[in-house]
Amino acid sequence: MAACRLCCLCPCLRPLGCGPLGRPGRNRALSYLQMRALWSSTGSRAVTVDLGHRKLEISSGKLARFADGCAVIQSGDTAVMVTAVSKTKASPSQFMPLVVDYRQKAAAAGRIPTNYLRREIGSSDREVLTSRVIDRSIRPLFPAGYFYDTQVLCNLLAVDGINEPDILAVNGASVALSLSDIPWNGPVGAVRIGMIDGECVVNPTRREMSSSTLNLVVAGAPKSQIVMLEASAENILQQDFCHAIKVGVKYTQQIIQGIQQLVKEIGVAKRTPQKIFTPSAEIVKYTKIIAMEKLYAVFTDYEHDKVSRDEAVNKIRLDTEEHLKEKFPEVDQFEIIESFNIVAKEVFRSIILNEYKRCDGRDLTSLRNISCEVDMFKTLHGSALFQRGQTQVLCTVTFDSLESSIKSDQIITAINGVKDKNFMLHYEFPPYATNETGKVTGVNRRELGHGALAEKALCPVIPKDFPFTIRVTSEVLESNGSSSMASACGGSLALMDAGVPISSAVAGVAVGLVTKTNPEKGEIEDYRLLTDILGIEDYNGDMDFKIAGTNKGITALQADIKLPGVPIKIIMEAIQQASVAKKEILQIMNKTISKPRASRKENGPVVETVKVPLSKRAKFVGPGGYHLKKLQAETGVTISQVDEETFSIFAPTPTAMHEARDFITEICRDDQEQQLEFGAVYTATITEIRDTGVMVKLYPNMTAVLLHNSQLDQRKIKHPTALGLEVGQEIQVKYFGRDPADGRMRLSRKVLQSPATTALKTLNDRSSIVMGEPVSQSSNSNP
């Protein structure tokens, strides 16, 4: 049976091979499904790509056959299924409506979700970040003007805890799109490169990654071109980084060849879209006549800032659109808008390519004016304001106890290997940063991605044994390009202001790219690299290449490329140009603060450890943790147990620590403890009667201890009342020291009933030791 593509539940079902249904477009849909069913009946197709000591298995044709494209990528026992579907009706949006969702299923790790509903809810940070990597790898290869809703879903089928699934998902998206009829100029291949003992490792295992100084993801296109880069590193040298990129590109070509082989075997025909949303040459030509000179005047007026330039361009836009509507009354509104965008972009880029000048008057390698300020607010643990041109970022540092670190549940640990972390950076981009209005609730994907990049930049310089959880917040107050790298700079300043002993200061910069392409060959003929790009240069350019690091090396990198591929040569030049700019920025930052404060601020938190002997642990904790809860409620401290006798105390202020110290001294004070002598007999007072025994005290300020039923009498009893014992009654007990396992006091009344000479001691007079005859205690009388 076959159904139309719009709905597999359509009631109009016909056996394959039957006559037409008499509906427009039905014959085409039926033949499409017939072809797909015939292909799938032959079984799935698969290829294996050898990546040195790793193998990548690519298969299709067995699962999700109604989707436009589907692929299963497997490495070891980790498998990811990726589907790609695109509508045949154009979207009303004026951009490429691509949605990528990567989902990690608990079942893939053999687990059940731990939330209340016991099912997957929402997307984790890791899922969002992986989705962004996939999106940035495949988006540049869609044809210009293809405005059709397209969805790529990545479903984790199985994870073995050895091979990482995110790289498989990127390759799976490439295969699914390549095998579909969706217009896409792929394929791409992706690998992860690690560096262990100076050697590059392709697609390292989770254990290998734990000892790697580099985590580099490379997405490559045919002809050894680069589509996407993302990396975090332990401050590795520039030459090592460049070598790792070249190794990654080499192995991406092997994956691309495997995908191309599979596509050739299956024989894929791409669909012809109903319409590609690009304006006609006639409209573009007329737009140039109207607006080109005006735009040139605006883009070469170096007195403009972001606001005034945008206002001038918008004024030209409105005037141009009015003329175009009069000249072409029947043309779609989108074509009019897009024609102006094309002309504005062309003028902007030609000034850079031909005159080596930028719209703010800088040359290609100059930085914007930079100013730094630290210790903005005295009550904060650390703060800094970083201003670069019209991009302004306020960063703060907050310390808390290690109990406040980000905890990973069993499922996340099983799938990603992510453990607790005590350093985090949260990035906020409020609407007012660009003079707009909008919602400020929640964190969107862009904020999450920018914050993760800045966190990667700073994480390698944070000491591993720092006794606090560190939270850096970065709030963008003004934005005109490269706010994520400004966050890395501001975060570094704030950490030093807070007294965090970072190994080195960190700075970041964004490098842009403007190219001139041969229309016949599709190759780059000429290009310009721009240091420290503006927002308008990012919008009209071909690449946003962000790099961060110290004076010594690189800690983070991210390349967002709009072209279907960039040669390695350009990437290498961008890294070199960014490294020079990074050192210039560090010199400016060092003028404000060059090293961390020698000590944290006076109002900062304090961490101390206290030793509590096993004998006093019960008193320190209290019944049901009463003393600890009271201590934390009254002083605001956080207490965590390090080992059997050691407790770590975090206090938000030195005053709180002083109060906590006095509280602990008071509850643990026991000035008569040392008088107890092993084997001596003491008079104890019953304070409570329980089913299991009686609670007794040997002296007034002592914590009551349990005298078990088995130690009350030679006879076996089930309840203390059988012996006539009452609260307030005094009995004689023999002291046998403390249990070495839990520190509890060991007392016995039973042994005193045996005929033996005993020494009766009193705690009221230290010198009094009464030697007596064998003690005989009545079960129903006071001793």
Curated annotation (Swiss-Prot):
Modified residues (N6-succinyllysine): K552
Record domain KH: where: 605-664
Molecular functions per Gene Ontology: 3'-5'-RNA exonuclease activity; identical protein binding; miRNA binding; poly(G) binding; poly(U) RNA binding; polyribonucleotide nucleotidyltransferase activity
Membrane topology: Peripheral membrane protein
UniProt enzyme class: transferase
EC number: 2.7.7.8
Reaction(s) catalysed by this chain's protein: RNA(n+1) + phosphate = RNA(n) + a ribonucleoside 5'-diphosphate
Presequence boundaries: 1-45
The protein's assembly and partners: Homotrimer; in free form. Homooligomer. Component of the mitochondrial degradosome (mtEXO) complex which is a heteropentamer containing 2 copies of SUPV3L1 and 3 copies of PNPT1. As part of the mitochondrial degradosome complex, interacts with GRSF1 in an RNA-dependent manner; the interaction enhances the activity of the complex. Interacts with TCL1A; the interaction has no effect on PNPT1 exonuclease activity.
Family recorded in the similarity comment: Belongs to the polyribonucleotide nucleotidyltransferase family.
Protein's UniProt name: Polyribonucleotide nucleotidyltransferase 1, mitochondrial
Annotated organism of origin: Mus musculus (Mouse)
